[in-house]
């Protein structure tokens, strides 16, 4: 309930905001007549004028009225669409960093043109985020026509694009793409080994389309880049041999319900005998414990042909709920490898997390964030709490006259679907278009078979082929059209009564080989005549559909979120058109089963109602709404929990990525390295002198450790007076100062040696090489350890401890330890690396992966010539290969794809030489001229 109270509080002052936006919109509309008089060239010149005024000190708020008026006039000349007052209000709300709640069909895509144009004038880039690649490409081409006409560059980020193509797209004034693509590019940039490999250029302003879907539905699944771990597969095979020898209830116990195992003392002793070790639990052997646990779990908890199948020498997971095989999915934390070892198939490398971020924390990187949706009101509290975004409801352009009928509840699912088919057949007969919403692909296919059996022509959309689905949705408003769609299918495309003329005209032009990006001039010349021709065809159909009652939306099941139900309903009744909606439910529906469906079934049984007679009661509708509210609250808590845990990682990630950025950008790291030497020597001395008296210090042991770190020139016996036979008291401070002076002196000699070998400035380059390599490896190891910590942290609740507080505390301790290890390893490498001058590489020949192909002349050193590149053995700048990308699909579920899919078979992050990348960028940049307007002057 607190969220509901907060929602009401957040809506206080809404009226004032809407009035302010309406006043701004009136002023923009009043400027319209001034800009109508301008020629195309004069209108385009306004962009440069605005940029100059911004550079001279005017703010974007100062430019808002004029910039909006220019973009509005350009939209009319290019698209034959002029923003309504409510769309201008929506655009202003977006610019001010709010979520504009605009009903379906109110023109959100066109609305976005206004704030995107205004904010692009700053030159810092604008990101427009959509739910799938098709919409990103469509909007970049379609709305990009307006921006290109006004002299701005538009880019689009799609799956399968190479890094040079992505770099060009991000360099554009406005960049379209999906949340996953933007997020993964951010993570990859923070795995890059050279400035040339970076693709993004900052996070200035983002407009998120379908903001509730992206920031809420998909926020439960974090973005993860994983790659092969370094673990050896030898141990999987060894423990697969041992596991069958262990006896249940003698060596270990199993809890089938909780899916856990526990190893007894007898089991530990048996394993120690088998491996020939003294203590399984000593520090050096601790990794073996997880191999043992996984081997026993593979034996007892994972059954072949139930939990997984073996096909073509590969272990494939079976979904426990649907029974479908999940190709490409793998169990994590070594479990999949343990099953592979048990089955005797080839053991694939274990994956580990290399980089991760939640969508919440990614979008909080932006200086300004805004979004559009038709249904944000129910989640206003969450959007405010997590993203600090206000929700502004924008009035509809025309009054809504759709009729929302009350729900019909049937006893069985079969009776419900029979009633659905009867209702659809009747409406199809009278020429009324029908959109049927389902919650799954299986339900869609089942209904499709029923319609085929009854001879009802129909189309099925399953959110798999977005481009074809947009074409079907464009014609879903035709008389008598019947369209079956899952909740996610065909989003972003309006169902216009009689047919969507813009989409249909675009399809016709593309069939003729015309394209708004590739052939802008020919496309623009043919656009208006084709559009007028299509409008003439669809106008008559639209009148017939209005006579039949408009679009009828039929839901076959209530979704657990009211928002999804409202999205489905919102397909009907756009722009003041007539329409109708109704939900058909059954007691077998998921939501009804979860929340007191048994009580309702008892009532229906007592009333002795036949299966095919529905009940229609407000009490039931209220109960369903209450159930949905409970589920929404549960999901909110899950997302909040994900965010709380990621907040720990986020602070650590900010430190590490900030440090990486400094190194990549060529900052002088000498001061930092000197501080590292001081910290490491101090830690060594403090550890060795923890006992208060000199006679208790083991200085020989300290010197042995120091000699592995750097070439020590001091003799401790000299410091204590043993050499000259005059023992003297040595304080901890004196010892520390002497060693620090010696270490810094040794580092100065090392710098002379390196600079003498490869030229002045070479030591600075080596520092950057070493720090970057060690930082990346330590961060990967830290992520691996944090994954393990998070996996078992929930058990702390059994000891009356808050798992989150424990995770924060231990996570901080682990991070501090990781930073200490990073300093120690970096200092050791810098003193002891074997370095040789790199011979020039012939074109096309790659450097051995075990060697560092170093940074060239990235530092503006005052030396007469750039330092010669060095090879440092054991240091690598090669980006990890064979990566997997895990992120939410449109339904919020985790989906996995590989490097090859992400880059379309191209090479990952460091694709091509610098010259090749520049050539690709130039080629990509060609043909970016703005289209000509149809208007003649």
UniProtKB/Swiss-Prot annotation:
One of its GO terms (biological process) is intracellular protein transmembrane transport. Residues 890-900, 913-927 have a biased composition (Basic and acidic residues). It is found in: Cell membrane; Cytoplasm. Its EC number is 7.4.2.8. Residues 928-937 have a biased composition (Basic residues). It catalyses: ATP + H2O + cellular proteinSide 1 = ADP + phosphate + cellular proteinSide 2. Its main location: membrane. CDD domains: DEXDc_SecA, SF2_C_secA. ATP binds at residues 87, 105-109, 494. Keywords: ATP-binding, Cell membrane, Cytoplasm, Membrane, Nucleotide-binding, Protein transport, Translocase, Translocation, Transport. Residues 881-937 are annotated as: Disordered. It is a peripheral membrane protein. One of its GO terms (cellular component) is cytosol. InterPro entries: Helicase_ATP-bd, Helicase_C-like, P-loop_NTPase, SecA, SecA_CS, SecA_DEAD, SecA_motor_DEAD, SecA_preprotein_X-link_dom. It comes from the Bacteria. One of its GO terms (molecular function) is protein-exporting ATPase activity. NCBIfam families: PRK12904.1 (NF009538), secA (TIGR00963). PANTHER family: CHLOROPLAST PROTEIN-TRANSPORTING ATPASE, SECA INNER MEMBRANE COMPONENT OF SEC PROTEIN SECRETION SYSTEM. Part of the Sec protein translocase complex. Interacts with the SecYEG preprotein conducting channel. Has a central role in coupling the hydrolysis of ATP to the transfer of proteins into and across the cell membrane, serving as an ATP-driven molecular motor driving the stepwise translocation of polypeptide chains across the membrane. Belongs to the SecA family. Monomer and homodimer. Part of the essential Sec protein translocation apparatus which comprises SecA, SecYEG and auxiliary proteins SecDF. Other proteins may also be involved. This is Protein translocase subunit SecA. It comes from Nocardia farcinica (strain IFM 10152). The gene is secA.
